[in-house]
UniProtKB/Swiss-Prot annotation:
It is found in: Cytoplasm. This is Protein-L-isoaspartate O-methyltransferase 1. It is an enzyme of class 2 (transferase). The gene is pcm1. It catalyses: [protein]-L-isoaspartate + S-adenosyl-L-methionine = [protein]-L-isoaspartate alpha-methyl ester + S-adenosyl-L-homocysteine. The active site is at S69.
Length: 218
C-alpha cells in the first residue's frame, strides 16, 4: 500500500491492528483473513466525514440506504468462504467495494454485482486506487447473480433476501459454498453447500443486514 493509502492518525496501521486484535478476541480465527483486514484501508471506502470511524467494529452508511458492513461480519463471512478454498467467487452487493477488496486478496477470481450505479462507480475507483486487478464488476439486479460467468464455487451475499433465490443456487458449482444473511426482521447467517442436486444448509448466527432488493438504480 502507498503512504497515501496507509493514512495517518485514526486511519493509521496501528489503528487497524487494534481492530484486528478486537476481531481475534471476538472469535475470528483465520490468520489470513485477519492479515488482509489489517492491510486493506477501510477508510478510503467511506466519505471523508466518516473516515475517522473506519476502524470501529460497526457498520457505517455509504449512501443510497446502504451500509459498509461491520468488520466482524466481513471477516466472519470471508473466513467461512475461505474454509472451502473457492477459486471463482461471486459477490452480490459490491456496495462500497470494501468486502470486494478483502476478497480480492484471498481468492483468484472475483465477480461482483451491484444494482446501484453510483455505488459501483465509486467502488471501481477505490479498487483502482488499490491496484486490484482480479475483480470484474457488473451493474445488475444482484438477486439474479451472474449466470453467464457461472458456475461459481463460492458465492457471498452482502444483503439479506427473505430466502436465497433459486437462480443463485443454480449458479453454485457442485461442492461450492454460499454464504448469506437470510430473513426479514429475524435474520440469520447461513452456509449452503451444494452436493449434486442437494443443498445442505447450516444456520450459523443472528445478523442484521439491509434487505436484498430487486431492480437497478442508474
Amino acid at each position: 500500500m502507498t503512504a497515501q493509502l496507509e493514512g495517518i492518525g485514526m486511519t493509521s496501521r496501528r489503528t487497524r491492528m487494534r481492530l484486528v486484535q478486537r476481531l481475534r478476541e471476538g472469535g475470528i480465527e483465520s490468520d489470513r483473513v485477519l492479515e488482509v483486514i489489517g492491510q486493506v484501508p477501510r477508510h478510503i471506502f467511506l466519505d471523508e466525514a466518516l473516515s475517522h470511524r473506519a476502524y470501529e467494529d460497526t457498520s457505517l452508511p455509504i449512501g443510497h440506504g446502504q451500509t459498509l458492513s461491520q468488520p466482524y461480519i466481513v471477516a466472519r463471512m470471508t473466513e467461512l468462504l475461505l474454509a472451502h478454498a473457492p477459486q471463482r467467487v461471486l459477490e452480490l452487493g459490491t456496495g462500497s467495494g470494501y468486502q470486494t477488496a478483502v476478497l480480492s486478496q484471498l481468492f483468484p477470481e472475483i465477480y461482483s454485482v451491484e444494482r446501484i450505479r453510483p455505488l459501483q462507480d465509486r467502488a471501481r475507483d477505490r479498487l483502482r486506487q488499490l491496484n486490484v486487478r482480479n475483480v470484474l464488476l457488473k451493474h445488475a439486479d444482484g438477486g439474479m447473480g451472474w449466470p453467464e460467468r457461472g458456475p461459481f464455487d463460492g458465492i457471498i451475499v452482502t444483503a439479506a433476501p427473505v430466502e436465497v433465490p433459486r437462480e443463485l443456487l443454480d449458479q453454485l458449482a457442485d461442492g461450492g459454498v454460499l454464504i448469506a444473511p437470510v430473513g426479514e426482521e429475524n435474520q440469520v447467517l447461513v452456509e449452503i453447500i451444494r452436493k449434486g442436486n442437494h443443498f445442505e444448509r447450516h444456520n450459523l448466527e443472528p445478523v442484521h443486514f439491509v434487505p436484498l432488493l430487486g431492480g437497478v438504480i442508474r
